[in-house]
């Protein structure tokens, strides 16, 4: 968090102010944000303009108090408050123009320069799209019911919120598509041969539309038809290795693993729901009974959609008909499923699409339709984000599919995300700032009252004027919103206290202690997280101001104490002149600052120091996060927050607030100390000036504290229950507070929620001087309403704003969705790159994915590469749009994981899981993948590891003349061939005619390569042989007799074609022998076994006569058809047709959407690919954004005007 204004040193501060003064004289603009400098010659305090910046979200990064980046901007924000639409425009001065657009209140007041309202508006009434027009929503409200909420006695008040009905739009992550997209599709190769002219039977127009795509794919002359990944899947295969570096280029298991990861992410993030259009056909024009009267407008492709056309080859049609005799196959709309009110939910459709895409469509639709969010859940969600005295009612939910914002193990995923991706806190803070800024609690005045008083007071001590001149600097609404929001934002690293000269030994040094006390009263959570630094500064001042007390204090209490077995052990200070370091961690370890001990003897040993500590300590108590728990937001056991303020239920200024009493006491005590301790420094006139300053500060404190207790108190009650604020803030016990102790622990590494160590967060710099700006430079909503602040102190009687939940429900749900997505990605990485985590029932599939990847070989940098690769798939955006871009940055603590656990860590010691202390979900490895995402992941796993897994092991090099190439032919080495497992012991030399030749040494006999016969050289590992050995082997297979080189462990990806025009025989035997064993070779195989005779095209292929590279394993599992031609009107012997598993539509489990074969076998349990399935198609009126009306009746206003 940036300070109000940061300078490297006083010289820079003076220079910068001088430059800005010159710039201001050149800019004649009206402004209301001020900064103050002291004129070098007049002794007066001049006012000059500064530019402020408001947090914004750009390129996935929040520029707010958690970053040092700033950007000037003009934005328009709209806050719906009951019937009001309160719009403010922030200009470059940070001052808002506020327009109250409520129907019965027409007031406009400006606090600064007015800019054009050009930016996106938040909180405006959403546009109602066709799925829920205004007439529908007007009817929806008729079913509203009152939620369970304690109703306060109604009294006659001026309400700005009564009987309000708002529309809540729940933006879902599901999307629709009317054109089915397969994950697997047919690919056909046409043979280029001389063949008899094919005969086509005529078909009518309707049949031509229905059958033509399938006739083109399975036409006469087709050599082979095989299954390939569709373009949307295949494009994910990396061109180069991006994750796991290898020593060679080309395709490797690293590429393959990265491809698997990308496909799993693609499936896991998929939320597409099919909404097909249909048309009716004349049944009399179609002879196939499997084709139903209502069919999709997008025609599918399948052998089943050509078999009744009587188109050549007829034998193929007849063979398919025989094949499917006992199978369940239908094309088109099978039935329509209605709900209890006879409203269409979805159509059950038979369609040629692979079972994986069909299952994914079905799963998405059923998840969407099955989101059973109960009425009380919606009520709890709205209440969690609402003013506590709003009586909530909502409309009927019967036709609404509201996205769930809760699931099992949410807390684990939130904790994991914060530990491993700490930048997420920026988004948490951005949400809090959005909320607080919309409340418009503070406005900035045109001049600072403290400066004004000092400017006009002739009795003021010059050192005090200079001190305030130094401390009071820029303040704007952005800074104010930042600081107040930080009280509820989880702080995960010790903030850095802004450095400056504390003027030790001078009276003004006690003003700095007063500043720290006032800051602690207003911001105890931030204070708690930098308590060590604050103590160091207080003791540094007291070392000179109250030296005797200081010496007694450190002699008895030291700087720190530990708690051992429930007892305090104070650490003695050896050197009484030693200054306490600000860098010691008193937040996460077992050190506590002694100044804030609860030891009762402190007041007798060092009464002044005890008084300072007492003034700083919070007096309020913890409030349970009951509404957050009811809304099913992630929370720890006994979750609570400290609201630093106390409720103020009386309008007007006749009763001082509790916070005012504390601040009054602090000002009174510290000024008495100033006058007492530095009596010799003040003559009579300066002493009177100090008294007048004290009186002014006391006067300014009252309206500020009215706002804190009367308005901000209620804002904090809402913010404490927001989803993102799941980590408790301070408990108010400065003597014993420990930050959240949970951490992700893995293989001896600890990644904490709250980071420890002596390093401070340089990006979260706190300047406690904000208290002087709040006192002297602001008006506030509560004060304006009752006439304590504002223009001429005239009461406006406009209720302070409590933002309505409209603007925060969607960001809240999307934040949860984004964390689920990022944790799911991490879950995928753990599943593949770690062998210690499995999915029950999917061990075999995961083992296939892990081939070639062993955990010790996956470095931390490679893990980071994997995250970055996936990040690029997710895209970027803020919490309203897309998964969080920056969450996958790994510069901080993200590292390679093996089997992470969430555990408490005390004093760097990992604590065991304790059932009555720790959440149950922390007992085992966190479930990073949400259950619905797990189903999508399992679908991808099955697709990747079944017949579509095209990596084959085992090749044989053997040169043989071939009339035809048949990919179904697997080379088998004859039994009479001797197999030698090749080693360097089988290589020798022989000298002839004074020339040394390399030869083979087989059975003790030296043999030239050309003389080798009936030998199989088994090469278990490639890429390790010297050049002369490779040369010998190649000469043996080229010139020897019946010689083989078998490579049982070599990996390759076969590509098959029957089209001679596509065949590129680029793989050389030498390359196979010299390539590293991790390489996966891409080898094209030519299939021309069905040529009726050698054609001129075939003879033109230079290597068609000889074949050297042979597969020793089956490579044809993807081939679905072969040889669609006639041999004298009959089926050629080498021709192939589909298997039943490909064409068996079967049925589905309508509970889960999982495809099932006619036999009852689940298709996910088979390695075979089914290209005809039952898919669910939703009606266009079913898939729509949920829109409900809610009404909030305010039973008690913020201010109860008399």
From Swiss-Prot:
Query: From start to end residue, where is composition biased (Polar residues)?
Result: 27-45
Q: Which domain of life is it from?
A: Viruses
Subcellular location per the Swiss-Prot or TrEMBL entry: Virion
Q: Where is the composition biased (Basic and acidic residues)?
A: 10-21
Q: Spell out the residue ranges making up region: Disordered.
A: 1-45, 73-99
Keyword annotations from UniProtKB, A to Z: Capsid protein, Inner capsid protein, T=2 icosahedral capsid protein, Virion
Q: Which InterPro entries match?
A: VP1/VP3_C
Quote the Pfam families the UniProt record gives: VP1-like_C
**Would you indicate the residue range of the signal peptide?**
none
Q: Could you name the Gene Ontology cellular component terms for this entry?
A: T=2 icosahedral viral capsid; viral inner capsid
- Can the keyword Transferase be found in this entry's annotation? no
Family designation: Belongs to the turreted BTV-fold inner capsid family.
Protein purpose: Inner capsid protein that self-assembles to form an icosahedral capsid with a T=2 symmetry, which consists of 120 copies of VP2, with channels at each of its five-fold vertices. This capsid constitutes the innermost concentric layer of the viral mature particle.
How is this protein organized at the quaternary level?
A: Homodecamer; each decamer is made up of two conformers of VP2, called VP2A and VP2B. 12 homodecamers assemble to form an icosahedral capsid.
Other remarks on this protein: Function inferred by structural homology with BTV-fold inner capsid family.
Identification of the protein by name = Inner capsid protein VP3
Query: Can you name the source organism?
Result: Aedes pseudoscutellaris reovirus (isolate France) (ApRV)
- Lineage, broadest ranks: Viruses, Riboviria, Orthornavirae, Duplornaviricota, Resentoviricetes
The gene for this chain is: S3
